[in-house]
Amino acid sequence: MTSGAPRRVGPRMAAAARGVGRPLVAAAAARGVGRPLVAARGVGGPLVAARGGGRAALSSAAAAGELVTATACYPPLLPSSTAKSKAAKRRREEEFYQRVLASPSAADKIRLLTKLQRLKYVIHPQTVGVAADRWFQHFTKTAFVPGLPASLPPGPDPGPGLTELKSVVCEALLQEQFYLKKRRPFLYREREQTVLPLIGNLVPRLVSSLAGRNPLLGRSTLDREPQVGFYWSRGEQTVPRGHRKGRVDPIRFQIEDKPCCQIRVPQQLPEFVPLENSIPENVPVIHLEPSRFPLFQRQYENNIFIGSKIDDHACYGHTQFHFASEKLRREKLVKDNLADQIEVRLRANGIGSLFAWTGAQAAYQGFWSEADVTRPFVSQAVITDGIYFSFFCYQLNTLALTVRADQHNLRKNICWGTESMCLYETIEGGDVKGFNDEVLDLLVRFLLNRPEAVETKIS
């Protein structure tokens, strides 16, 4: 560019030449608008403070003692409740837990907990699976203790009372196996035709005979072949196929049980051990899928039921009596070289049946996985094929079996059990030979179990 060429002027230079721009900013500063105002308010960072004296304003505001609150000015940002993200899943779970916790009654809690129907593993306590007791212990977080708890009430003293009870049992045995003429049973139904009437006849007679020693039995309710069910979750698995493929779902279980008869009482039985008591027996941990047991998945209405409605006054369990079906027939298991599975299947039956019944009782009182029990729930069971009797006691210490609730849960449920004992050897000529008094003693001890608050009247 030559020196004689005209110089091009930009817009800013033209505005400055006309007196526009900076004089206006100066005028605004004179009126208290712009950077001096920001500095006076004490708002901004080091850059604003350097330009307009903000640092001095901040120090003066702190000296003035202005209060700064930690309350958020805006509501928190929540994930979408319909998204597929993990945050959205956590939000849905939290909202569901809050709805259940806010439910006013146990019936509403059970309705919400059983509302969603998904595929679940259906457990039948009498099963043909190998090592079924270890699987059932894992599903229910139950530790098995051989023998019976020491806190059971003592049996009756030898005397006229015990002799009378023995005559009641012998008469019931003769009634079903000697006096009555019965038609030829169907195939594999011979024992069922004899044992079911025996239990139905023996239990009411023992209850009525012992009602004078245990007033709780006088206010009890006897159910014949009730439906008992319990629904819960334990563990997690990934959905393998379908429109929900890849989702992580809890492993759901449903126990369907039908005892021969059961006794319900209006008062809860006393605990066998304290709630937080630690026992040396461990709960087996199985890392295989339940389908390897094998268990099969079905989808139908979830059920939590003790054999009566929630409003029934006798809402606590006392003793169940189970018939050992053909799946537990000793002769068949010995013939199939499965003699070692006889006691295993009996233990599995006791653990599964008592967990379902006792867990449903706790659910009737408003407890569930996120609101764990505050007191133990106790039930008893007797499993018999008419000749051999097995006795089990169960104490429910926790319902927190989900992955979320079981992270720091040190409690475990406890089941005590005996090996099967023979009641008698044979019946010949209207006489019961080889009668085992120990079995009768345990039957009486089970039926005499009661809370300490119940008044005892010995007739």
Q: Model-derived features: where do they sit?
A:
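Charge-rich, low-complexity intrinsically disordered linkers/tails
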Residues: 2-6, 10, 14-24, 34, ...
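Long, intrinsically disordered low-complexity tandem-repeat segments
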Residues: 25-50
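Short terminal or interdomain "cap/linker" segment that borders an active site or interface and mediates
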Residues: 59-60, 372-436
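Internal, well-ordered interaction modules that form the hydrophobic cores of assembly/scaffold domains
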Residues: 334-403
